[in-house]
Amino acid sequence: MEISYYEILEITQNADKETIKKAYRKMALKYHPDRNQGDKEAEDKFKLVNEAYEVLSNDEKRAIYDRYGKDALKGGGFGSSSSGFGGFEDLGDIFSSFFGEGFGSSRRRKSSNDEKIPSDFIVNLKLSFKEAVFGCKKNIDFTYKCSCKTCNGTGAKDGKLQTCPKCQGRGQVGVSQGFITFAQTCPDCQGIGEKASEKCSDCKGLGYNESKDSVELNIPEGVDTGMKLRVNAKGNILKNGTRGDMYVKIIAAEDDTFIRDDDDIYIEFPVFFTQAILGESIKVPTIRGEATLNLPKGAKDGQRFVLEKEGVKDVHSSRMGNQIVQISIKFPTSLNDEQKELLEKLSESFGIKDGMHQEQKGLFEKITNWFKS
């Protein structure tokens, strides 16, 4: 069954205009795209909320809807106006009238003095597992932007700009969704409200030129994926001549043997069943070579042991992480006659007769007595 406009706004059918307005404000805030970016369900609900309000806030449309339903509003001159809501001159005014200067028209129009380029930028640097753990030197090639001196970063010939014809100098254009129009940055002038009547021949209208450079970087020991290293004064060059920074984002490869978790290293190490039963000192690999692990008697499959300070050095201090060794007990898959005979004798020495251990026999007896009781 189709949900009614009153249910969409969570109000009763006899609600007055003020109640409808308050309900709309509440629901529009809840499902507004700016607060639910990437949420398709919220976007659909936002459209329904606007559709419901457009009808219920209009006395004529509401009367027709109450009497004949939604279908009666289709066609017949009762559709929404070309702007989504009539009577609001500036884009986003529908929201500013309800919510103040927090939505739509409150977006600051950019100034022609604003930079077309950010001062800082990020480059990705891929490292091997060992390079990230132990540090290394890397030569990084990169491209940076420099504000065009010919046009002073405007992108216009001789630096002269004219009012943007698409947004009429507002820096915003309207985009309709359902029954509402909201503002977004003008794609032609990027929100400045002005654009070049003739492009600068030097930068081709971009407002900046690109140059290539390289730098040798000392990668510290212990970096990991997602960490950023700042390289001072290697960013973009702005109109006033100041230069930003370049940030190098680390992408560290994984290893086939070792698993890294921050500064700790994990490894699964195979142990023969006799070693686990009898206990033994064994050699295990570490990121720096090998270390001795003293297995206790009766070690269990999946049991973990900590080798202190055998992990990765913390990138911000001298603290060392640990290595965690998880043992995996292995059993022989084939036996020769001598091995089979030895194991059979061992089995008998533990009291296993007729295919059953004494503990298993005791359990069966308990279950049998349970059925008899």
UniProtKB/Swiss-Prot annotation:
Protein residues bound to Zn(2+) 2: C164, C167, C186, C189
Record-annotated disulphide pairs: none
Residue span(s) of domain J: 4-69
Start and stop residues of the CXXCXGXG motif repeats: 148-155, 164-171, 186-193, 200-207
One BP annotation, GO: protein refolding
UniProt keyword terms in alphabetical order: Chaperone, Cytoplasm, DNA replication, Metal-binding, Repeat, Stress response, Zinc, Zinc-finger
CDD domains listed in its UniProt record: DnaJ, DnaJ_C, DnaJ_zf
Keyword Chloroplast: no
Zinc finger (CR-type): 135-212
Note on how the cofactor is bound: Binds 2 Zn(2+) ions per monomer.
Ligand binding (Zn(2+) 1): C148, C151, C200, C203
InterPro entries referenced in this protein's UniProt entry, alphabetically: DnaJ (IPR012724), DnaJ_C (IPR002939), DnaJ_domain (IPR001623), DnaJ_domain_CS (IPR018253), HSP40/DnaJ_pept-bd (IPR008971), HSP_DnaJ_Cys-rich_dom (IPR001305), HSP_DnaJ_Cys-rich_dom_sf (IPR036410), J_dom_sf (IPR036869)
Any one GO cellular component localisation term in the record: cytoplasm
Family annotation (PROSITE patterns): DNAJ_1 (PS00636), DNAJ_2 (PS50076), ZF_CR (PS51188)
SUPFAM superfamilies assigned: Chaperone J-domain, DnaJ/Hsp40 cysteine-rich domain, HSP40/DnaJ peptide-binding domain
Cell location: Cytoplasm
Molecular-function GO terms, alphabetical: ATP binding; heat shock protein binding; unfolded protein binding; zinc ion binding
Keyword Chaperone attributed: yes
Family matches, as Pfam families: DnaJ (PF00226), DnaJ_C (PF01556), DnaJ_CXXCXGXG (PF00684)
Superkingdom per UniProt: Bacteria
Subunit architecture: Homodimer.
Function: Participates actively in the response to hyperosmotic and heat shock by preventing the aggregation of stress-denatured proteins and by disaggregating proteins, also in an autonomous, DnaK-independent fashion. Unfolded proteins bind initially to DnaJ; upon interaction with the DnaJ-bound protein, DnaK hydrolyzes its bound ATP, resulting in the formation of a stable complex. GrpE releases ADP from DnaK; ATP binding to DnaK triggers the release of the substrate protein, thus completing the reaction cycle.
Record-stated family: Belongs to the DnaJ family.
Name the record gives this protein: Chaperone protein DnaJ
Source organism of the structure: Campylobacter jejuni subsp. jejuni serotype O:2 (strain ATCC 700819 / NCTC 11168)
